[in-house]
Amino acid sequence: DEEKFENASTTSKLRVLAAGSSINLLTGLLALLLLSTLFSRASSGAVIIETVEGGPLDAAGIQRWDVIYAVNSTPVRSVWELAEYLDDASPGDPVLLSTSRGDILVILGEASGEGAERAWSMLGAAPPFMNYYESRLGLGSSFNIHLYLTLYWSFTVFLSIAVMNMLPLYPFDGERFLYTLLRRFAGSERWLQIAINVFSLCLIAANMIMSFMRNLILI
């Protein structure tokens, strides 16, 4: 409890405060290790996550989580390669898609927008989009996609929690960790805790201001 924590040694306090973030960090790194071990680094197709009801893909029987590997026998290894290939196509053109369901003939629909947006509109695909990464497990594209997403988001979420929890701001553990560490040298003055929070807020504010100024320059 809190009383035992306050009476513990500085080393014990630091271990307790670092435990949560350390576990989250290790879990995130484990997910990243599995991600890099189980999946190829280069994408090999485009995953259809959403289709427009009544659109060309929907009419052809292509469903959510299907993978497009090639168009007219030309490999497309990413959503952008798929969009680039269809850049020269026109509404009404027939295209043969090599998919995880087999070869499927699709008649392109009406085009709207420019670039990639034009390609998606002709296919009848809706965002979001993602590249397909082949798994070394060989258990099918649908399983590969869900396993990839699970590991990817596990890495992202656990790493974010670990970093956020170690921010030197109240009420995160990082604030108490830094306070406990500095208190060993500066005593138990309350001003130390306030100074840590003020300094951290200044860093965050400076980062936000610099980001805003950079965006103004880019505009």
Task: Say what each PLM segment does.
Residues D1-I219:
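Hydrophobic transmembrane alpha-helices and their immediate loop junctions
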